[in-house]
Design a protein with these regions (language model features):
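Glycine/small-residue-rich loop that forms an oxyanion/phosphate-binding "nest" at active or ligand-binding sites
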Residues: 1-30, 37, 53, 57-58
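Beta-rich, blade/repeat-based domains predominating
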Residues: 1-5, 31-54, 83-98, 106, ...
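Flexible "stalk/tail and boundary" regions
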Residues: 1-5, 13, 68-78, 94-97, ...
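A short loop-to-beta-strand structural motif that recurs across blades of beta-propeller domains
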Residues: 13-15, 67-70, 108-110, 149-151, ...
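Short loop/turn segments that connect beta-strands within beta-propeller blades
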Residues: 18-23, 72-76, 112-117, 153-157, ...
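A short beta-strand motif characteristic of beta-propeller blades
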Residues: 23-29, 76-83, 116-123, 157-163
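Short, conserved, GDST-rich strand-edge loop motifs in beta-rich repeat architectures
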Residues: 49-65
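Anionic-ligand binding region
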Residues: 69, 90-93, 100-112, 116-121
Length: 197
């Protein structure tokens, strides 16, 4: 949610809704996108969306080569970065001027600069990363399907498990007021809540 608008990634379109009434607003079509995944808002009003570069195959997801991170400004999307080197970008987080990317394919956490250059890349845990949130102390929480866990750490520093045994932990959320981590268990259609301060 940014500026009273709810943004929702839907395969190749970012749908927008009035955050109060939920009335549909304009759609932002992203030509060539195959698996729009996470959406994050920057403090400057820019909206970022990841394309994990996947499609449903016969038995599992298959790569499409459309791996990208887009920025949406004034209802138009343009790529910040577009390359299979992005490693199937999934979770996004904007902290000030820093754009963090958690990848499902390469299991990396990295930042993208304004020109789309990948920096500070680090492999985390057992990979298959999904959601990412920022805590008040500046540390990050990142969910990992590969490790069935949520990891905590600071950029350029080691990460450690803070929640384990959560199969398919998807795009996590954090309630700063109550110190609660919300972990959707994608394959089980449920959300678990953990205290993390």
């Amino acid at each position: 949610i940014a500026g009273g608008v709810l943004y929702v990634a839907d395969i190749s379109v970012v749908r927008t809704f009035d955050a109060k009434t939920l009335a549909p607003k304009a759609d932002v079509v992203i030509p060539g996108a195959t698996f729009l995944n996470d959406v994050a808002a920057g403090p400057d009003g820019k909206i970022y969306v990841s394309d994990s570069g996947l499609k449903q195959g016969e038995k599992d997801f298959e790569p499409t080569g459309t791996d990208a991170v887009y920025v949406i400004e004034k209802g138009k999307a343009k790529p910040v970065a577009k390359s299979t080197e992005l490693g199937k970008p999934n979770g996004l987080l904007v902290d000030g001027k820093t754009l963090y990317v958690a990848t499902f394919g390469s299991g990396e956490l990295y930042t993208l600069d304004a020109k789309g250059k990948k920096t500070d890349a680090a492999k985390l845990g057992k990979g298959a990363l999904d959601g990412i949130v920022l805590l008040g102390d500046g540390s990050l929480l990142v969910s990992s399907w590969g490790g069935s866990e949520v990891l905590r750490g600071k950029a350029k520093a080691p990460f450690a498990s803070v929640v384990t045994g959560v199969k398919a932990p998807a795009d996590i959320g954090y309630d700063k007021k109550r110190g609660r981590l919300l972990v959707p268990r994608f394959l089980e259609d449920k959300v678990e809540v953990f205290e993390v301060k």
